[in-house]
UniProtKB/Swiss-Prot annotation:
Modified residues (Phosphoserine): S735
Summary of subunit composition and partner proteins: Interacts with CDC31.
Enzyme Commission code(s) on record: 2.7.11.1
Residues the record lists as binding ATP: I29, G30, R31, G32, K33, F34, G35, V36, V37, K52
Gene: KIC1
Polar residues: compositionally biased ranges: 615-626, 656-673, 693-726, 743-756, 901-913
Name of the featured protein: Serine/threonine-protein kinase KIC1
Catalysed transformations (reactions): L-seryl-[protein] + ATP = O-phospho-L-seryl-[protein] + ADP + H(+); L-threonyl-[protein] + ATP = O-phospho-L-threonyl-[protein] + ADP + H(+)
Comp. bias (Basic and acidic residues): 808-821
Species of origin: Saccharomyces cerevisiae (strain ATCC 204508 / S288c)
Record domain Protein kinase: where: 23-276
Keywords assigned: ATP-binding, Kinase, Nucleotide-binding, Phosphoprotein, Serine/threonine-protein kinase, Transferase
Pfam families in the cross-refs: Pkinase (PF00069)
Disordered: region residues: 308-347, 615-760, 787-831, 901-956
InterPro entries: Kinase-like_dom_sf (IPR011009), Prot_kinase_dom (IPR000719), Protein_kinase_ATP_BS (IPR017441), Ser/Thr_kinase_AS (IPR008271), STE20/SPS1-PAK (IPR050629), STK_Kic1p-like (IPR035062)
Length: 1080
């Protein structure tokens, strides 16, 4: 029996005929976007059809959609795997569209019994790709591919239906710009305004449909459509992560869900993918098993939910008068119902309701027998899909009825009926969507945060908390939301505000649109990590569960800037992804909005071994403990300009225990050698009152005070707030020839085995071990003996030299792997911004009054031992807002030519890569050779200063070196002194000769014109305030960031231009002196 197909024009032309005399409707099998879908038959032939009756009394836009659908169906009727169109008829204000009837039902319905095997997914995707290949050749975009629009016939054939929003791409412009489709299946380019798209959007929707079939629901189905659209644009594409899925299926979804439409494969290419080829030979008849499984599931759960083919009782299109299917395909019963059905058409709800094709008229026993289905091959109902489903509301399918809670009768909660307020009077009522028993596991949080928030009519929110926190690996447990919340009197729980009571969320300003305008207040200091232990800060995939409840999605297109952890003496609490963003690369340093002040000194700890004293600068923003590490790789935001980084943290440095000697700040204090016989070992040089520059916008001033006295080899460590960001250079496993990548415009990559995940390393002191005894690493003012320097070299417990360097001729130049490991603490200090009030320590006159001759290094004056190269008295610097900060590691190349650093305008970090002569990135900042630069206020071209007698009482020799101030010059002159590696020094040279050489080097530096610029005397403190008073009593916000950046650049430029002279001085001072084994 065949029927003459009629296209749209013919159908409309023949509309004068009474269509009811040609086709009879028997029952309602679903409701579409604009009308009701009936099951009917042709009166003459008895062939069954699907009759879509549309009401044309709606808006003109909807009429155009109907006409478009008819047009596409007429043009695509010869394509396989697409619901065939037979014609359309106009009756009064109703349009009858005659279509192929797919008795099997929608794929969405077949998913109800539970998870389906991948063999079925492969066949379904293969058939859909064949359909898409054909329509894409005709430049037609379906734009609404989802499981509900995929029909399965009784024979197992796959049909793609519902072309209501399909679009024809014309030949002149092969791309579209209008938004259409269902939000949860939309491609990012469809959602973004002003972005053109093509047929590749169907490939994205196909990938989401595959994800839906595999997991039960599309991504973001637990949030509203508008929020889901934002997440689709800003988040990374969904991926299947569970181990139960095959690699080929994961790959197929990844190929479909490519962010770049150009890289997204076409339907023809996807047919050649591994997943499709694996199921190439599987026949479509295997899908009959899915139909049989559903029919058995339906019979088993008849009493727990309504049959899908019937319309809910509260809806206007109640099919009470629709006839039941008859054995003769129609008959008198169908004839009697025509009038009532016509009235029903006029009462159709015009709401946007999902198409729900019916196959419940089939008998399970008859179907299984007729098709010879092997019941043993059918997968049993997967009960785990139903567990914990009751706490999720599916916004992707909001109009699906609440059929059941789980396949068993263990249901203790009342039903919620969609479209009514029945059951909503109880605080424990859950908005239920159980069309899909998606596999989830309960996500519990600790008692601080509710795991469920339920909106009830009593203006209260019921909460439920459970025991220890666990996490699911598949789907997320979100705070449910009732469909009719907008009509409730209580406060609406939205996806944005329901999470604020639970855990801090990533700032909304950190997005792909305005990441550069992020406010410092948007970041949470790490102290909140101990309170909010379950902040999920690394959501890479939208379908993975959060560690805290609530719909706390956020964008992943711009990585979250890391939070700052300040308490490293306590183990970080919370899950492995709490609060800290671990990054294997250096992070740019943000300018603090307030000037960090060092806190008052605190009593020294009785047991310094238990206190981790310092940590690398980059650890302040990337530090993570093994318990809080993650596998996320930090990706710097593309639109955030990278600032100069003063640290180049290496991940391979390990923490070391604190012993009883001075931290290896080398000659960090600008103090001379006193020849006073009763010179004691007590010293407090280089009080590292270092304020870490607030990174990531944090205003926390991380300061550490390390006042170390050594009267009896007892080390005391005073810490406050956080550890100092001093750079511990333990060169374990490192090479001195390795140049760190110090470009401020790019991140510094490390090996995959090295990450900044370890706790911040502890500063390693100069212990009694034989590997840290270089004479230049010992403070010159703290000789641990009151005798001469000659006797020091014979002291077996405090050796100042090591034969490891000088006993071997091959290691005479010190350019070897041991130098970095044995000289970890060379560093340079530089001042941070100072307050408006002029500090007395910065005044050269005040500093001069503290000394006999106005210069540090005077013999016999103990107060001069604490004046560093910037004129700061470090003994009292702990109470003033003056900080020192170390520089990064440097490459060693003593034999190379001295290079001049590039201009600051090219954003090159000369401290990391431009100066090959700098030792490990740390220069000897102490005034070893008596270089006096205490005249802070002097100009750059200042002449020779007062004579500085550097007295080194060695028993028979006194050396006086006439030193001058090093003035900064615009270009560094080339050195005329031979490199250290070319200098030969007799083996009997003692320490006094080295000091003499150092003093000579200082004079040679001055003769070459090197100089250092004095530090700034004062800074305008108002640049740290974002408010200014423009009228009495009124203030306005002003952007001070450019001014602060300018001041920082000036400081860095001063620091850069002072490096050549320091390098030159180091080159002259670091002399290899061979010493016999029996002389040390």
């Amino acid at each position: 029996m065949t029927t003459k197909p009629q296209n749209s024009k013919q159908g409309l032309a023949e509309g004068e005929m009474d269509v009811s005399s040609l086709f009879k409707r028997t029952e309602v099998i679903g409701r579409g976007k604009f009308g009701v879908v009936y099951k009917g038959y042709n009166v003459k032939t008895g062939r069954v059809y699907a009759i879509k009756v549309l009401n044309l009394d709606s808006d003109s836009d909807e009429v155009e959609d109907v006409q478009r659908e008819i047009q596409f169906l007429a043009s695509l009727k010869q394509i396989s795997n697409i619901t065939r169109y037979y014609g359309s008829y106009l009756k009064d204000t109703s349009l009858w569209i005659i279509m192929e009837h797919c008795a099997g039902g929608s794929l969405r319905s077949l998913l109800r019994p539970g998870k389906i095997d991948e063999k079925y997914i492969g066949v379904i995707m293969r058939e859909l790709l064949v359909a898409l290949k054909c329509i894409h050749k005709d430049n037609v975009i379906h734009r609404d591919i989802k499981a509900a629009n995929v029909l399965i016939t009784n024979e197992g054939n796959v049909k793609l239906c519902d072309f209501g929003v399909a679009a024809q791409v014309n030949q002149t412009s092969l791309r579209r710009q209008t938004m259409a489709g269902t939000p949860y299946w939309m491609a990012p380019e469809v959602i973004m305004e002003g972005v053109y798209y093509d047929t590749k959007v169907d490939i994205w929707s196909l990938g989401i449909t595959t994800y839906e079939i595999a997991t039960g629901n599309p991504p973001y189905c637990d949030v509203e459509a508008l929020r889901a659209m934002q997440l689709i644009i800003k988040s990374k594409p969904p991926r299947l992560e569970d181990r139960s899925y095959s690699t080929s299926l994961k790959e197929f979804i990844a190929l479909c869900l490519d962010e770049d439409p150009k890289e997204r494969l076409s339907a023809d290419d996807l047919l050649k993918s591994k997943f499709i080829r694996a199921h190439k030979a599987t026949p479509t008849s295997i899908l009959k098993e899915l139909i049989s499984r559903y029919l058995l599931f339906r019979d088993k759960n008849k009493n727990k939910y309504k049959i899908e083919g019937s319309i809910p009782e509260n809806e206007p299109s109640k099919p009470s008068e629709a006839p039941k299917p008859s054995q003769n395909g129609g008959g008198d019963e169908a004839q009697k119902s025509i009038a009532s059905n016509d009235n029903e058409i006029k009462r159709v709800n015009e709401g946007d309701v999902e198409m729900k094709w019916d196959f419940d008229s089939l008998s399970s026993s008859d179907y299984i027998i007729e098709n010879n289905i092997n019941l043993d091959a059918l997968a049993e109902d997967n009960n785990e899909w139903a567990t914990a489903q009751h706490d999720l509301f599916n916004y992707a399918y909001p109009d699906e009825d609440s059929y059941y809670f789980d396949p068993t009768s263990h249901n203790t909660r009342p039903f919620v009926y969609q479209g009514t307020t029945i059951g909503k009077g109880y605080p424990g009522t859950i908005a239920q969507n159980s069309t899909l028993n998606a596999p989830v596991t309960n996500n519990y949080t600790n008692s601080k945060y509710p795991s469920k928030m339920v909106a009830g009519t009593t203006n209260t929110s019921g909460t439920h908390t459970a025991g220890p926190m666990t996490s699911s690996k598949r789907l997320e447990s979100k705070a449910p939301k009732q469909l009719l919340e907008l009509f409730e009197d209580n406060e609406i729980i939205t996806a944005e505000n329901d999470v604020n009571t639970e855990a801090p969320k990533i700032s909304k300003s950190i997005s792909s649109l305005n990441a550069g305008n992020s406010s410092r207040d948007d970041f949470i200091p790490s102290i909140s990590n101990e309170v909010n232990g379950n902040i999920n800060n690394n959501k890479m995939r939208p379908h993975l569960p959060p560690l805290s409840s609530g719909n706390n999605y956020y964008s992943q297109s711009t990585p979250a800037l890391p939070l700052l952890q300040t308490k490293f003496n306590k183990t970080s609490k919370g899950p492995p992804t709490s609060g800290l963003t671990t990054a294997p690369t250096s992070i740019e340093i943000e300018i603090p909005e307030e000037l960090p002040n060092s806190a008052l000194p605190t009593p020294a700890s009785a047991d310094p071994v238990l206190i981790p004293s310092t940590k690398a600068r980059s650890s302040t923003v990337t530090a993570g403990t093994p318990s809080s590490s993650s596998s996320i790789q930090y990706k710097s935001p593309s639109n955030v300009p990278r600032r100069l980084t003063v640290s180049n943290n290496r991940p391979e440095h390990c923490p070391s225990t604190i012993t009883n000697q001075k931290l290896g700040s080398a000659v960090a204090s600008n103090s001379g050698i006193s020849s006073t016989p009763n010179n004691s070992n007590n010293y407090n040089n280089n009080t590292d009152s270092e304020n870490s520059r607030g990174s990531s916008g944090s205003n926390t001033a991380n300061s550490t005070q390390m006042g170390i006295t050594n009267p009896g080899n007892v080390t005391k460590l005073s810490t406050h707030k956080a550890s100092s960001p001093s750079r511990p250079l333990f060169g374990v496993g490192t090479s001195p020839n390795r140049k760190p990548a110090g470009s401020p415009t790019q991140n510094i990559g490390h090996n995959s085995t090295h990450t900044n995940l370890a706790p911040p390393p502890t500063m390693k002191p100069m212990a009694n071990s034989k590997d840290n005894k270089d004479i230049l690493l010992q403070p010159l003012n703290s000789i641990p003996s009151s005798s001469t320097l000659n006797t020091i070299s014979g002291n077996s417990s405090n050796n100042l030299t090591s034969s490891n360097y000088f006993s071997n001729e091959k290691e005479g130049s010190r350019v070897n792997g041991d130098f970095k490991r044995n000289n970890p603490n060379l560093k340079l200090q530089m001042p941070l911004p100072t307050p408006v009030v002029r500090n007395k320590l910065l005044d050269p006159n005040t500093a001069t009054s503290q000394n006999n001759n106005g210069m540090p290094g005077s013999a016999g004056i103990s107060t001069n031992e604490n004046i560093n190269q910037f004129g700061f008295n470090t003994s009292s610097a702990s109470n003033i807002p003056v900080s020192m900060t170390p520089i990064s590691e440097k490459h060693i190349d003593f034999g190379g030519k001295i290079k001049r650093s590039q201009s600051i305008s090219n954003r090159k970090n000369s401290s990391a890569s431009e100066h090959p002569l700098n030792i490990l990135g740390s220069s000897v900042s102490g005034n070893v050779s008596g270089i006096g630069n205490n005249n802070v206020g002097s100009n750059n071209n200042s002449g020779p200063n007062n004579s500085v007698p550097l007295s080194a009482n060695t028993g028979n020799t006194t050396i006086k070196a006439n030193s001058t101030t090093i003035a900064t010059s615009s270009s560094a002159a080339a050195s005329t002194t031979a490199p250290i590696s070319q200098q030969t020094i007799p083996s009997g040279t003692q320490f006094n000769h080295i000091l003499s050489s150092a003093a000579t080097a200082a004079n040679s530096v001055n003769s070459l014109g090197f100089g250092m610029c004095p530090p700034p005397q004062s800074l305008q403190m108002e640049m740290f305030l974002d408010l200014e008073s423009f009228l009495p009593g009124k203030q306005r916000r002003v952007d001070r960031k450019p001014q602060v950046l300018k001041e920082l650049e000036n400081l860095l430029q001063m620091f850069e231009e002072g490096l050549p002279c320091i390098e030159h001085a180091l080159k002259e001072q670091l002399i290899s002196t061979p010493i016999k084994d029996n002389e040390h």
